[in-house]
Amino acid sequence: MSFFTKTAQLVSGAAVAATLFTATAQAETVLRGASMFDEEHAFTKTLRKFEELVDEKYDGDVTFDLRLNGELGVESDYVTFLNQGVAIDYTILAPSNMAKFAPSIPLMDMPFLFRDLDHWNAVLSSDVLAPLEDELLEKADIKIVGYTGGGTRNLLSKQPVVTFDDLKGHKMRVMGAPIQAQIFQALTAAPSAIAYNEVYNAIQTGVIAGFENEAASIQNLKFYEVAPNLTLTRHSITVRPIVMSGKTFNSLPADLQAVVLEAGEEAGAYGRELESREDGVKLQEMVDAGQLTVSEFENRDKMLEMVKPVQDAYAAEIGASDLLEAVRAK
């Protein structure tokens, strides 16, 4: 029996029960959440904040049952569960895991989408992404109630990469989505989609000269041992939607729906501040320990101009050209 089938059988009954209500005001609502991480991770802390805010704002009885450390599967499982309205009611997801339902949603992960943290926060605090939210709800029956994230991805390399001469032909690992390689090819680098668990050895043996990542992952997996030079390209700032099953959301009383949306927005703002702050702290810890040398790229504005044609073509391909322009204009 597959993990998905077994899990669905075990918990679908509980999930259905969580979304059935009596006509009395005293009826208790039970909502089950899922996190891939432990209590110390920023995403889990954000979900806990969401729960806390709902408890504070809602006069009725709501019980939360948040399962941690991947107990209910991985994110791809969560997407299926949310779509079907079984097993879980709320979680945090990477946009890429929802692409099979909503083709334009990976725009959130496109490199150089955001000019800086202020632009990123302005977009996520507005209704600019409403078309993506509508698409996801219509096609996947998954409702976005807030946005967290905040980890900033930069270049990490054996030797310093601070000029376009350094970047030209630079052999680097990128994530598997084609847009990732296309962006760095436009910047004259030589990207390849090496498996993440092979990156350390690939740098150590000279197969690649570097890669790109967030400070937390660099620190946790000690990538600084083989690539001690970090260049502040700030090419990606993480966006992670806080989501709820549409079936669950629609089953809630109207006053609880309003509270969920308010709590999701506030929890998202909390999570963004938390993760972006932790990102800076972890980076500084590695600098203070002498593990990393940090440099600014000499002309990041030119990077933004060089990648625009690639971004435009990608947005057109996934039907998100108007959305891309709206993000840029924010």
From Swiss-Prot:
Name of the featured protein: Solute-binding protein NAS141_03721
UniProt KW keywords: Periplasm, Signal, Transport
Protein family according to the UniProt entry: Belongs to the bacterial solute-binding protein 7 family.
Residues binding alpha-D-mannuronate: 75, 97, 153, 173, 196, 213-214, 240
InterPro entries in the cross-refs: DctP_fam, TRAP_DctP, TRAP_DctP_sf
A GO-annotated cellular component: outer membrane-bounded periplasmic space
Compartments it resides in: Periplasm
NCBIfam families: TRAP_S1
Species the sequence originates in: Sulfitobacter sp. (strain NAS-14.1)
PANTHER family named among the record's database cross-references: PTHR33376, SIALIC ACID-BINDING PERIPLASMIC PROTEIN SIAP
Binding site for alpha-D-taluronate: 75, 97, 153, 173, 196, 213-214, 240
Function (record text): Solute-binding protein that binds D-mannuronate and D-taluronate (in vitro). Probably part of a tripartite ATP-independent periplasmic (TRAP) transport system that mediates solute transport into the cytoplasm.
Assembly behavior: The complex is comprised of an extracytoplasmic solute-binding protein and a heteromeric permease formed by two transmembrane proteins.
Signal peptide: 1-27
Short name of any one Pfam family annotated for the protein: DctP
Location (main, coarse): periplasm
GO terms of biological process kind: transmembrane transport
